[in-house]
Amino acid sequence: MTLLLDTHFLIWIVLGSKRLAAFPWIERYRPWGVSPISLLEIQFLAEIGRLSVHNPQFVNELMDDPRFTVDDAPLVTLVRHALRLDWTRDPFDRLLAAHSTARRVPLCTADRRMLAHHPLLPLELRE
């Protein structure tokens, strides 16, 4: 795994969002790393109506999509790293940043708070 996708990047890729046009370099990082935390977040967003998913098997199909590698980092490791990340109160963001840190791979995100605080970003996202 050379890159871990933040949840919104994963959603953009799956839905073929036009927002990806601003990030043509992302293709170089295939297959993209995905945290199980993102899969849980997608399910949560669908359950609360913030993401319209008409296929009940959507998350399961993502796990089998050859474009992605689901990285099964030990949860206890992620929690240990997440405990040190006090710059966000979002548990999903905290665990995704922790996953990136634990695996020492860049986190691909467009989240301003994460861009400002997380030290492991792709060169293309560093200011």
List the model feature ranges, each with a label.
Residues M1-V34, I48-E61, E124-E127:
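Short, well-structured N-terminal submotif of metal-dependent ribonuclease cores
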Residues Q57-D86:
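Acidic catalytic patch
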Residues L5, V34, D72-A73, T109:
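Short beta-strand scaffold positions
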Residues F9-L10, S38, T77, L96, ...:
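Alpha-helix capping/helix-boundary segments
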Residues A97-E127:
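Acidic, PIN/NYN-like endoribonuclease modules and their adjacent C-terminal/linker elements
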Residues F23-I26, D64, M114-L120:
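Short loop/helix-cap segments at secondary-structure boundaries that form the rim of catalytic
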